[in-house]
Design a protein with these regions (language model features):
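C-terminal accessory/regulatory regions appended to core domains
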Residues: 1-168
């Protein structure tokens, strides 16, 4: 069923999401089917509760992360953001990637905490800009553009993790 995760939390299937409402509904659902509540029930009911809890947790993780949420919405449109046609980046983004990677390598080898923090801030701003572009792409139903942005978002998230790992 398409957009099952949104239905589970009774949220509209759209990129823009009320995080507080998602958190509230997650806590309510998680409490409802927590496996401990089913300790005195049959093995079948315990297994059902465990499966439901797993689904709720997976749905929550997917919807909570904007890039994963975007990829999930694209799947509902039969678009795989990881398909080969979406793995090619625009030349400008490729050049920017190279610059960021070089800056990370230099700052890391020099153990320059200030340069690493500055790069982390730059990537954080790029991530915020990308999320705005994703919102616009979904609003305009430009799903191919959204798929490209998902790939860029994954790159930025990975780079940000590498920067954080390099920070003392």
């Amino acid at each position: 069923m398409k957009n099952q995760y949104f239905s589970l939390f009774q949220l509209p299937a759209q990129f823009e999401l009320d995080s507080a409402l998602l958190n509230e509904r997650y806590r309510a659902l998680a409490a409802q089917c927590h496996p401990d509540k089913f300790a005195a029930h049959s093995a079948f009911e315990q297994k059902q509760a465990m499966m439901m809890a797993t689904t709720i947790n997976e749905a929550y993780r997917t919807l909570q992360d904007p890039i994963q949420r975007a990829a999930y919405l694209l799947q509902a449109q039969d678009i795989d953001a990881d398909a080969p046609e979406h793995t090619q980046f625009a030349p400008e983004f490729l050049m920017q990637q190279m610059e960021w990677r070089e800056a990370l390598a230099d700052a890391h080898s020099e153990q320059n905490e200030q340069a690493l923090q500055q790069l982390a801030n730059e990537i954080s701003q790029a991530q915020q800009d990308l999320l705005q572009q994703l919102q616009q792409a979904f609003s305009a139903q430009q799903y191919e553009t959204a798929a490209q942005l998902v790939r860029q978002g994954r790159f930025l998230a990975k780079l940000q993790q590498e920067i954080q790992a390099a920070l003392p």
